[in-house]
Amino acid sequence: MPPPTASTPDDSADPGPDFADVPPTDLVKVGFIFRPHGLDGELKIDPSATDDPARFEVLPTVFVGPHPRRVVRHDIASVRYQKTKRGITVILGLDGIVDRDDAEAVAKMDVFATEAALGLEDDELFADDLVGWTVVTEEGAVQGTVADFMEMPAQDLFVVRTPEDTEAMIPAIDDFIIEIDEEAERIVVRPIDGLMDA
């Protein structure tokens, strides 16, 4: 009987996403992948995490994944825009995502870029930077802390964890947000009846 031979891996098996071993530590969320666009691997991106969708035109590379610590690096191949009822949607082409199946595999994931690539000024903030900040009224009454930031079709929302350990939603618009105090890491809000109701 011949000796047993070592099994070899099946090269045809799908290894899954090639997540970066050591992702950059300065990743900032710049978009969210709605779904594929067409059959050639293009992606529909919600760019509301950045104040300027045109940033994508100057980015050489982005990182795609469910979390900034678990991402895949992609060079940007193409950028164009589409007007929708919700505003501007970015149609993004990425190297390595070449057909609809590839695009489906990354749908509903986030898109990140490094602070260095974005050329952020020292005083520039993204919504994710505000998680953990204190929310207070003009009179200084603590309303809670920012637990999350939600990008919604009508308007973006801050999710606030109240002192009673409930969640409240604050629209991220000028009618509600009076001041964003970076030095104190707090957001000053205008109290409106029902605003902080869970």
Curated annotation (Swiss-Prot):
Annotated compartments: Cytoplasm
rRNA processing found in the keyword field: yes
SUPFAM superfamilies in UniProt: PRC-barrel domain, Translation proteins
Chain positions covered by the region annotation Disordered: 1-21
One GO biological process term: ribosomal small subunit biogenesis
Ranges that cross the membrane: none
Keyword line: Chaperone, Cytoplasm, Ribosome biogenesis, rRNA processing
Disulfide bridge positions per record: none
Gene Ontology cellular component annotations, sorted alphabetically: cytoplasm; ribosome
Molecular-function annotations in GO: ribosome binding
Domain notes from UniProt: The PRC barrel domain binds ribosomal protein uS19.
Function noted in UniProt: An accessory protein needed during the final step in the assembly of 30S ribosomal subunit, possibly for assembly of the head region. Essential for efficient processing of 16S rRNA. May be needed both before and after RbfA during the maturation of 16S rRNA. It has affinity for free ribosomal 30S subunits but not for 70S ribosomes.
Family from the record: Belongs to the RimM family.
UniProt protein name: Ribosome maturation factor RimM
Encoding gene (name): rimM
